[in-house]
Design a protein with these regions (language model features):
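Thiamine diphosphate
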Residues: 1-58, 64-87
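Active-site-proximal beta-alpha loop/turn segments in soluble metabolic enzymes
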Residues: 63-64, 157
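Conformationally flexible catalytic loops at phosphate/diphosphate-handling active centers
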Residues: 93-184
Length: 184
């Protein structure tokens, strides 16, 4: 991510919990990425691999935006929305679905092809992301310490990015709907 690569990962339950410290950093640095999560229960008094949202809900405070799906077709379509929106919004996404029924369902779906999605990528936002990448040719300092006054001001300035997310997601849902004929 810091090198300007577009990335995503796939995980569930305890694996997602191990990522929480990194999620704060990713969101705080406005690095676009998507975590695809097969939402499952967390181990408590016994081990259980059935679906609930306990793992996903434990990440709400990290700064990631969230999209949820209820069918395998929605997983296909809205994964595209998540990837497109994270680039434009600069906000990372958790894209999640039921970790038992949906993740194990065998169903015919209509695939979105790369050729369908490529024209939807905000090329300017992608170029800006890559221009901020760490590289030996353009060294920068990141992750410095701040006093409370500047830290608070910087955190408040982040709100404009989050306020833009719903409109960006809606825009891409409409564009995906135009391609697929399915309304989101």
């Amino acid at each position: 991510l810091q090198a300007g690569a577009l990335t995503s990962t796939y995980t569930a339950s305890q694996g997602l919990l191990l990522m929480i410290p990194n999620m704060y950093k990713i969101a705080g640095e406005f690095l676009p990425c998507v975590f695809h999560v097969s939402a499952r229960t967390l181990a408590s008094h016994s081990l259980c691999s059935f679906g609930d949202h306990r793992d996903v809900m434990s990440t709400r405070q990290t700064g990631f935006a969230m999209l949820a799906e209820g069918s395998v077709q929605e997983v296909m379509d809205l994964a595209g929305v998540a990837h497109l929106a994270t680039i434009k919004a600069r906000v990372p996404f958790v894209n999640f679905f039921d970790g038992f029924r949906t993740s194990h369902e065998i169903q015919k779906i209509e695939m979105l092809e790369n050729e369908d999605l490529a024209p939807l990528i905000d090329q300017q936002a992608l170029a800006e992301f890559r221009s901020r990448a760490l590289t030996p040719e353009k060294p920068v300092a990141r992750g410095m310490a701040e006093n409370p006054d500047t830290f608070f001001a910087h955190r408040e300035s982040c709100n404009t990015y989050y306020e833009a997310v719903p409109a960006i997601v809606e825009e891409y849902m409409e564009k995906i709907s135009e391609i697929t004929g399915r309304k989101y």
